[in-house]
Amino acid sequence: MNSLSPLFRRLAFGLCAAMCISAAHAESVSSYKVGATASGSPFTFLDIKSNSIQGVMVDVAEAVGKAGGFSSQIEQTNFAALIPSLTSGKLDFISAGMLKTEERTKVVDFSAPVYAYGEGLIISADDNGAYPDLTPLKDQVVGVQAGTIFYDQLNKLGIFKEIRTYDSIGEMVRDLSLGRIKAAVGDQPVVAYQIRQKLFKGVKLAPDYQPTNVGEVCLVVRKDDAATLERLNNAIASIKADGTLASILKKWGLDSQARP
């Protein structure tokens, strides 16, 4: 068998060295810039008393950091700007109530899941109509948060008079309570939490509605950042194994049975 040429050996050594340096660099990073939104409780929200972002995914980011040996610097970002901020390098990873979708995986990479949920249908508190799905809302004006998978869901149906988009769930619910829209679609656990906390008044979740967009909540990294993805996945496995993740979900009133 012919031995490897000197040129090939140098190229192979250089590639191996580059991979080792990349992995070592990821392991040496002591702090990450983490994108989170100010309006998505219980996943992420702005706590008025401390003037800081709090919630499930903030606790997850901190727990993952502790398990992985780094700190998480939370950066407040609008939901629609999370992925652009990540891909442009302003953020190192995203920790928010963002569902993994086929379209998003074309642009970014997702970690192992930390939770799973689907959409909820928000209606006026005095609306006693039957809503097993969205078809009863044909020719109505409905609302949805910009940048979410639920906009695509509504748009593909093509049955609505108008689809209005909002920067936050709070703005959307306010328009619903004022009668400006007939109904709205949003993150079921987010809306349920806000209603339990009496932060959303005059609205309710349609009790008979069955979600069709059930997805996984994950941490999100850039496509070219395999080393950070591996570091996060190892840390997620650790907080699942030792019960930390289950404790976080329980703290915020989420059903641990929905956890993948």
Q: What do the predicted segments below correspond to?
A:
Residues 81, 97-106, 153-156, 182-213:
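A ligand-binding cleft/hinge motif common to bilobed small-molecule-binding domains
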Residues 58, 74-84, 129, 164-178:
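Short helix-initiation/N-cap motifs at beta->coil->alpha
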Residues 71, 149-164, 202-205, 236-260:
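Ligand-binding clefts/hinges and TM-proximal coupling segments of bilobed small-molecule sensing domains
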